[in-house]
Amino acid sequence: MYAIIKTGGKQYRVTEGQMLKVEKLAQDVGQSVKFDDVLMVAAGDELHIGTPSVKDAAVTAEVVDQGRQAKIEIIKFKRRKHHMKRQGHRQDFTAVKVTEIALGKAKKEVKTDGA
């Protein structure tokens, strides 16, 4: 079973037990976080695709770590002018471990003509 979730402006394919680095979340280490914006769930040969998200589906994860990525350097310069600007950036992240992919009651609506 796997799911595609959306968090922090990005989409991730997750399975149960998977470790994942996502954009910084407000929860502390050891707390549980629930991702409700599930775009797709595949369970065996069943495929549930949301429009835009699957109703009653949720992915639960446990926060394992809060940290910062490796530094990237941004360098801007103007040729032949002896002018250079250096800048660095470290992005914050939250490492989570997916504990459960829950697919709620997926009810199919049947339209009937009132004739």
From Swiss-Prot:
Record flagged with keyword Ribonucleoprotein: yes
Disulfide cysteine pairs (residue numbers): none
Keywords: Ribonucleoprotein, Ribosomal protein, RNA-binding, rRNA-binding
Pfam families named among the record's database cross-references: Ribosomal_L21p (PF00829)
GO cellular component: cytoplasm; ribonucleoprotein complex; ribosome
SUPFAM superfamilies linked to this entry: L21p-like
Annotated GO MF terms: rRNA binding; structural constituent of ribosome
GO BP term, pick one: translation
Assembly mode: Part of the 50S ribosomal subunit. Contacts protein L20.
Function description: This protein binds to 23S rRNA in the presence of protein L20.
Family, as annotated: Belongs to the bacterial ribosomal protein bL21 family.
Record protein name field: Large ribosomal subunit protein bL21
Name of the gene encoding the protein in the UniProt record: rplU
